[in-house]
Amino acid sequence: MSQPRPLLSPPETEEQLLAQAQQLSGYTLGELAALAGLVTPENLKRDKGWIGVLLEIWLGASAGSKPEQDFAALGVELKTIPVDSLGRPLETTFVCVAPLTGNSGVTWETSHVRHKLKRVLWIPVEGERSIPLAQRRVGSPLLWSPNEEEDRQLREDWEELMDMIVLGQVERITARHGEYLQIRPKAANAKALTEAIGVRGERILTLPRGFYLKKNFTSALLARHFLIQ
């Protein structure tokens, strides 16, 4: 079997993207890094986004950290998801930064969260810490769009969380708010503050927040797909 090669330009169709992702299934991160001419770090402590960057290289992703989807021409977002030996997610999934100001008139339909989750290429990767990073294998990809029920679940959580932000309650939001979608602080250090709305409508400084999918959402999504296959 010939070895796969990284895509040198963004894929032109979903079929091409999925076919490339399927070729990576079963390879270890160390093998894929070596084939792409990269060095595999010993762990992810200083290179938290390394797996995502590696797979972006292999799949010809274009967006980098820009707000559009990773495969902007196709409207597809790439999400790597660390899983245990049973294929269950090991952590929550970052979606996008939560806007803390300028939210008047924003609806679920026009929200950044919905835009990012409209079409997602999920790639499970072995994530148990007992497996050295270079030996962790890439799993079967899933090209997914939310069904009606999933869209409703996400919408309800998003509306609840955005109401709290708009009403000046951002500091009261905990990871427990939202059944499937949560908001958590997202900052490398506690000094990186951003503007938000306070209880009396005043401007306050607070930690940047991010939207994350909870494990119960991604777990059900992956289980349903891989039982069907």
From Swiss-Prot:
One cellular-component annotation, GO: cytoplasm
Primary location recorded for the protein, binned into one broad class: cytoplasm
Keyword Nuclease attributed: yes
Keywords: Cytoplasm, DNA damage, DNA repair, Endonuclease, Hydrolase, Nuclease
Subcellular location: Cytoplasm
SUPFAM superfamilies, per database record: Restriction endonuclease-like
GO MF, one annotated term: DNA binding
InterPro entries linked to this entry: DNA_mismatch_repair_MutH, DNA_rep_MutH/RE_typeII_Sau3AI, DNA_rep_MutH/T2_RE_sf, Restrct_endonuc-II-like
Domain of life: Bacteria
UniProt keyword NAD present: no
GO biological process: DNA modification; mismatch repair
Protein family membership: Belongs to the MutH family.
Role, per record: Sequence-specific endonuclease that cleaves unmethylated GATC sequences. It is involved in DNA mismatch repair.
Protein name listed in UniProt: DNA mismatch repair protein MutH
